[in-house]
Amino acid sequence: MFDLRGKNAVITGSSKGIGKSIATAMALHGANVVISSRKANVCQETADEINNSDAASPYGEKGKAIVIPCNISDKTALEMLVEESRSQLGKIDILVCNAASNPFFGSIKDIPDEAFEKIMNNNIKSNHNLCQMVIPEMMERTVYYKHLTLPTIYSV
């Protein structure tokens, strides 16, 4: 990793799994992180773990974790996530699109249209919307910005 002191990161799907690990590592390296997923209580548990961790930062100071629950399938909720992140932390420096869903398990030949649409909306469209909301602000500040979309088993 590298020195993230003074940087603010929004990480979707960060209450558990890969997203939680990313948030924990970024906070350890100095970034303030937004813990976001659908379940506020699980987000709070993750934020508390990060904020109360005794792990030593290689840079002397850890970042803080805040909670902003969000259902990525709702564009209004995504707008609120961005607005609230800016309100509580300031500029957004890092965006990690980790949240995803898969309402169907089985062969692609059997997937119902509704399930396919949900997968596309949650795993593609929501990330596109979030990027459109955040990346322009990043590009205004610098030619180098950080955005990460994680391909998962749920991705196309």
Where are these regions (language model features)?
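Conserved glycine-rich cofactor-binding loop
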Residues: 8, 15-17, 39
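A short, exposed helix-loop element centered on a Lys and neighboring polar residues
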Residues: 131-132
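The beta1-alpha1 cofactor-binding region of Rossmann-like NAD(H)/NADP(H)-dependent oxidoreductases
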Residues: 40, 69-81, 113
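Conserved glycine-rich Rossmann-like NAD(P)H-binding loop of the short-chain dehydrogenase/reductase
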Residues: 29-46
